[in-house]
Amino acid sequence: MVILVMGIEGTGKTTVGKLLAERLHWKFADADDFHSAANKEKMKQGIALTDADRAPWLAAIREQIWRWIAAGENGVITCSALKQSYRDELLSPPPGMEGSADKIKLVYLHGTYELIAQRLHQRQGHFAGEALLASQFATLEEPRDAISIDVSETPEQIVDEIMHRLNLT
């Protein structure tokens, strides 16, 4: 199984994803690590990425997800996956793996604009900052088929809830 933890910046995807992977003894990958240097620089400057900017990034994340599934490995991967079209691409199985999409579980972390803005204001050393928050909320297409988790609780409580809702406890 692969758990895709999604949401806008500042929802705690990396913190929650790492903690979840540690608790389950699963592999972990952060989509931020798949961004090109050019994409990171754009975001650092507060410039929202275009779909063309995101295309190779999404392809690399998709490849990682399906590599784990093909190998029979369990993993947690974080990705903003703001648009339904991005999620459709990530969940689309490569040739020969049709029927395997049920091995991917989508977890949507969400919070109020105010809560996320406060978190971003406190966050240090990340290339994406508060300047992108409004554009991320505007771009977000809330997922239809995801486990929806409010991020006003602690990361530990959020992980407990995810594990409970996925019957992993």
Roles of regions detected by a PLM:
Residues 2:
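Walker A (P-loop) ATP-phosphate-binding motif of ABC ATPase nucleotide-binding domains
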Residues 122-161, 169:
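Small-molecule kinase domains that catalyze NTP-dependent phosphoryl transfer to phosphate-bearing small molecules
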Residues 98-119:
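Conserved phosphate-donor/acceptor-positioning beta-strand/loop module used by diverse small-molecule
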Residues 9:
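The conserved Walker
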Residues 13:
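Conserved lysine of the Walker
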Residues 5:
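Hydrophobic anchor at the beta1->P-loop junction of P-loop NTPases
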Residues 52-100:
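Glycine-rich phosphate-binding loop used to anchor ATP phosphates in small-molecule kinases
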Residues 18-61:
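Conserved substrate/cofactor phosphate-moiety recognition/catalytic segment
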